[in-house]
Each structure stands twice: as structure tokens, then as C-alpha cells.
Amino acid sequence: MAGKVRSLVWTGDSLRLIDQTKLPAVFEFVECRRWQEVSDAIRTMKVRGAPAIGAAAAYGVVLGAMECRGETSERLIAAVAAVIKELAQTRPTAVNLFWALERMENILKAQEGKPAAAVIEALRLEAEAVAAEDVKACRAIGTNGASLIKNGDGVLTICNAGALATVDYGTALGVIRAAFVQGTKFHVYAAETRPFLQGARLTAWELVEEGIPAILICDNMAGWLMQQGRVQLVIVGADRIAANGDTANKIGTYTFAVLAHHHGIPFYVAAPLSTIDISLDSGREIPIEERAAEEVTHLLGHRIAPEGIGVYNPAFDVTPAHLIAGIITEVGIIEPPYRENLAEALKKR
């Protein structure tokens, strides 16, 4: 899929998104012509993955501005500022969303007094830059991390940190793609990732599309595979990385990190620098999104749990930095001590 079809495409007057809720059964695009449709797509996970929702939100701002093209510059800027605030409420954990919206807000503030058409064009150019930079970063992440995968390795990953989770190519799957293209002989264990099944539906689909040898497993099989010596490396994505290296990612990631540590298996995070939130001292400060009970009690529209049962459904967990061997970024692999090295890496952005 990578390089062939992007997860999101700007058409000039709309944002086309792959509807990730329908994969792998149906490959279908959602056409967003209003910012509210982008907001809904992010909330309902038609588009998901930290870098992808950041880029989608940036284009959502452009759509919000285009809806006000007949207004005065002053009114347009006020309306777009309100749109940015609304888009920031869609999902709380992925920092790329807020990073992209902050960029759009900075551009908006710089347009004061300029004609409405100029404001819209400046916002469009910034959204295009956000998307282009993500593609470039993911390609570099793949290149920088590919050598970690050796011939004969079993590589475990969770959720979907591939082309679908970014504008194109992917973070954790970007590393896997790059190693595969370089000719390394290995196979991937894709954890299904309950309850939303991003691993089974999305990662497995990407791997099959690319022809990368892969095996789908249930999440609770990971420890047994490690004990049997079938896993030599774990690579995951990230939704937010605190200043000390603590990393929020899809629920279940922390479990894999603990298991990997117990079995002496290197555990790596792959993420662009935009995922690093230096304003948060540690993972304790990362807000964790809780999603609807129906994601746990229902499967493909059918109830699988009894009525009346309580449900706890956090979308993310936090892996402590001491369990992470390295963070693969577009400027290289960052290793401990994370507080100093992450701050230094951000200077290269």
C-alpha cells in the first residue's frame, strides 16, 4: 500500500480519507467537504493514528476557512480559531493533533489584516507542509531503524503504526517495510489489538498487501511466543512521548514491554519528533482517552458480552522509559538517557 494510496489526500476542495472502520472487508474513501466531517472522522476512527489525525485536522482547519471565504478577514480568522478549538477536542492522547493545530493557529495569527483569500491560501500551504513533512519523516524513520531487524528475526508489533496511521509509509511498519525492501529475511507477528482490532484489520491488511511474511496472533499469545524464542524484536508506534521517554501507545503496549523486558528482547518505539511532548515531565501527565463500552461488548455489530456488565475501555497505556531500548525517529535512534537526548533531538527539528 505504501506509496500507492495515501491514507488521506487533499483534492483542492475536500479531504479524501480511507475509511479505516471498514477495512479489510471494504476499501472505501470518505469525502470530507466540511470541517465537521473531518472532526467526526477523527472521533469515530475513520482516520486514526497520531500522525494521520494531525494531518487530517490541519486540512480540517483549511475546510473551516473555506466555508468562510465570503466573510471579512476578521470574521474568518475568528471563525477558524473556533474551528481549531473544536478539532482539538476530538481525541485527547495523540499529541500530533495538538502539534498540527498549533502550527495552523500560528499561521492564522500571522494573517491578521490580510484578505480572506490570502488567509485561506496560507492555511492550505501549512496543511500541505504538515502532510509532506510526515511522509518525509516516516521514510527516514524506516531507513534509520531497518538495520535493527536481522535475518531470521521474528518481529512483534501491536495496533497499526503503518501507512494507514500516517499520511504514508508508517512508523513501526515503516521500519519493517524498509528492512523488507533491503532484502532482510524475517517475519512479523501482528497482534490483533483488542478491542478495535487495528492489528487484525489494518496491520495484517497492510502486510498482506506488501507481501511481507506475517502471522496474526491474539494479544494474549505474545508471552508464550517470547518464551518459545520466536520473537527477537518488538517495534511499536507512539501517540505521545513525555520528556523522560515514557510513551503512550495503544492499550496492550505496556504488557508487551514488560514481557519483552522479562525475556531480554529489545523493545523499540518508532515515532516522529512531532510525537514528543517535552512539556510533560513524565507519562503520569499524559491524558488517557477512554472510549465507548460498545467497543468491548460488541464485535462487528453483535453483542458478545451480557447486558449489565461494567466495562473499562482505556484506548492507551503508558510504557515507562526504562523498558524502551530506543526511540526510532527521523533524526536517528534516540537512546537513554532520554530526557537529555530527546531535548537534543528536538533541536534538529
Task: Locate the predicted segments by residue.
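Long amphipathic alpha-helical segments
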Residues: 6-114
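Conserved phosphate- and dinucleotide-binding cores of soluble alpha/beta proteins
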Residues: 185-186, 191-349
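Ligand-binding beta-strand-loop-alpha-helix segment within the catalytic cores
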Residues: 96-155, 186, 190-234
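Conserved phosphate/anionic-ligand binding catalytic regions in large, soluble enzymes, centered on
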Residues: 44-60, 91, 97, 157-168, ...
